[in-house]
Amino acid sequence: MAFDFPDSYRYADSHEYAWQDAAAVRIGLSAYAVDQLGDIVFVDLPEVGAELNRGSSFGTVESVKAVEEMYAPLSGVVLQRNEALLANPEELQNDPHGEGWLLVIQPGDPSQMDQLMDAATYAAKVAAT
């Protein structure tokens, strides 16, 4: 299956994305990760004000197949969480790179974005799996 990974996004090995919008960064799960999970039934996200540490778990996503941890692609403080997604977790499947975003954070170290994969590198990694 072919996936569309937006060029302006950066991707972590653990399949989360980060998208810089002015001083804030939107975080979500890639379309590949969402596809692998199947039907999503529950999403657990941290509260606004919570601190994220790059590479550490910040929540879980539950599908009919499994419960998976989600890992922070960047360190920072949660500014916003997608409340609509908490009420309707299936939105994550419908539009993972758009309305299915998870969090907006204030990054602690914006240079961490440079350590994430660009879309072409991530697409090649996914194609090789």
Curated annotation (Swiss-Prot):
Any one GO CC term of the record: glycine cleavage complex
GO terms of biological process kind: glycine decarboxylation via glycine cleavage system
Family: Belongs to the GcvH family.
UniProt keyword list: Lipoyl
Name the UniProt record assigns to this protein: Glycine cleavage system H protein
Function per UniProt: The glycine cleavage system catalyzes the degradation of glycine. The H protein shuttles the methylamine group of glycine from the P protein to the T protein.
Residue numbers carrying N6-lipoyllysine: 65
Assembly mode: The glycine cleavage system is composed of four proteins: P, T, L and H.
Domain (Lipoyl-binding): residue spans on this chain: 24-106
Pfam families referenced in this protein's UniProt entry, alphabetically: GCV_H
Cofactor note: Binds 1 lipoyl cofactor covalently.
Cofactor: (R)-lipoate
